[in-house]
């Protein structure tokens, strides 16, 4: 997308210079593409994944259909959405304003529908929108999981990991995890300017698959401490490294520090995005950002609680950013 083709208000904003990885080149482990993948995880923890080949068309068709379906779901009255079966932090509904927002002292400006992969596979406590469209949600979750696992396999190969040291051993499909489909809606916020965006953070898990066709996502630049917008691109999704992969890689990979902040600090239109969070098996052990012994489930619970803490407490601890804010000297 050229600057002239951007929305007028974003025409002159600074954008992140992220690598693009071609997914088809990873199937046969193209050496040059593996090298670029490793470099992307080491340097930025964020990259574009090109999915424009004919083989990816089913993925895009499903994504556009599920995007339309969940947009309709978000149009329901809040009273109806609050009745969504919520059985864990990874499965259910999150209302606007439950967490700290992207501007200090303000709350977040998004609501979310969370569909845990374990719950989806087990047909457990599924909201009607999922039950009524089960083949669609099944197929889309499977596609996202496949993409994530192939990337993980390539990262293990790129680091020449063997046996139990390979990242896939911590992501077995027969073990429970907090892997989740995540549908986000940022409603127009002019009526409540105290609820804005999504706070600076790193993701909890291993890899995030993100479809964000509208502007608003920012990443932190370690080069000069500036926040840069991530440009939406056609036929490409965004992938970012989460805390667990950073810890499992001995902090060789960076978990990307990011946030969602509309220009001017007010969301002027409905904004939607779709994520799939690949997370390690609950029992996966590692040393966290404070070098304390932890596991994937404990880190998930600890970090999710931190999302809801006031900014003043978040600043005092490493949990919100997995230690990246302290390492990069990032501020709200």
Swiss-Prot record:
The UniProt record describes its induction as: Highly expressed under trichothecene-producing conditions.
- Pathway entry: Mycotoxin biosynthesis
* Keyword annotations from UniProtKB, A to Z: Dioxygenase, Iron, Metal-binding, Oxidoreductase
Which Gene Ontology MF annotations are present?
dioxygenase activity; metal ion binding
Upper classification of the source organism reads:
Eukaryota, Fungi, Dikarya, Ascomycota, Pezizomycotina
Q: Which residues does 2-oxoglutarate bind?
A: 271
Q: Which InterPro entries match?
A: IPNS-like_FE2OG_OXY, IPNS-like_sf, Iron_ascorbate_oxido_reductase, Oxoglu/Fe-dep_dioxygenase_dom
One Pfam family, please name it. 2OG-FeII_Oxy
What Gene3D superfamilies does the entry give?
B-lactam Antibiotic, Isopenicillin N Synthase, Chain
User: Which residues are listed for Fe cation binding in this entry?
Assistant: 201, 203, 258
State the needed cofactors, names only. Fe(2+)
Protein family? Belongs to the iron/ascorbate-dependent oxidoreductase family.
Note describing how the cofactor binds: Binds 1 Fe(2+) ion per subunit.
Biological role: 2-oxoglutarate-dependent dioxygenase; part of the gene cluster that mediates the biosynthesis of butenolide, a mycotoxin that shows antibiotic activity but does not seem to play a major role in the spread of head blight in wheat. Butenolide is derived from glutamic acid via a 4-acetamido-2-butenoic acid intermediate.
Question: Where in this chain does the record put each Fe2OG dioxygenase domain?
Answer: 176-280
Q: Which SUPFAM superfamilies match?
A: Clavaminate synthase-like (SSF51197)
Q: What class of enzyme is it?
A: oxidoreductase
Q: What is its EC number?
A: 1.14.-.-
- The name this protein goes by in its record: 2-oxoglutarate-dependent dioxygenase FG08081
What is the organism field in this record?
Answer: Gibberella zeae (strain ATCC MYA-4620 / CBS 123657 / FGSC 9075 / NRRL 31084 / PH-1)
């Amino acid at each position: 997308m050229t600057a002239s083709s951007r929305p007028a208000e974003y025409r002159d904003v600074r954008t992140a210079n992220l690598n693009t990885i071609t997914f088809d080149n990873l199937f046969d482990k193209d050496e040059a593409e593996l090298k670029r993948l490793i470099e992307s995880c080491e340097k930025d923890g964020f990259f574009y994944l090109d999915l424009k080949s004919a083989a990816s068309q089913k993925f895009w068709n499903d994504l556009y259909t599920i995007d339309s379906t969940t947009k309709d779901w978000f149009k329901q009255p809040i009273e109806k959405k609050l009745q969504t079966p919520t059985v864990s932090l990874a499965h259910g509904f999150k209302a606007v304003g439950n967490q700290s927002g992207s501007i200090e002292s303000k709350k977040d400006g998004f609501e979310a529908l969370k569909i845990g992969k374990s719950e989806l596979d087990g047909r457990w406590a599924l909201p009607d929108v999922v039950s009524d469209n089960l083949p669609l949600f099944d197929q889309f979750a499977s596609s996202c999981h496949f993409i994530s696992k192939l990337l993980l396999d390539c990262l293990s190969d790129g680091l020449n990991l063997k046996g139990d040291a390979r990242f896939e051993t911590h992501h077995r499909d027969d073990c429970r995890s907090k892997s989740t489909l995540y549908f986000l809606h940022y409603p127009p916020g002019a009526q409540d300017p105290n609820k804005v965006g999504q706070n600076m953070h790193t993701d909890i898990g291993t890899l995030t698959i993100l479809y964000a066709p509208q502007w608003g996502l920012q990443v932190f630049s370690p080069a000069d401490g500036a926040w840069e917008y991530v440009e939406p691109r056609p036929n490409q999704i965004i992938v970012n490294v989460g805390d667990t992969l950073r810890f499992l890689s001995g902090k060789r990979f960076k978990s990307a520090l990011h946030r969602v902040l509309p220009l001017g600090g007010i969301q002027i239109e409905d904004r939607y995005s779709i994520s799939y969070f690949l997370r390690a098996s609950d029992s996966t052990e590692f040393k966290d950002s404070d070098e304390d012994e932890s596991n994937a489930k404990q880190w998930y619970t600890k970090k999710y609680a931190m999302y809801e803490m006031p900014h003043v407490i978040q600043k005092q601890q490493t949990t919100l950013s997995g230690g990246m804010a302290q390492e990069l000297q990032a501020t709200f």
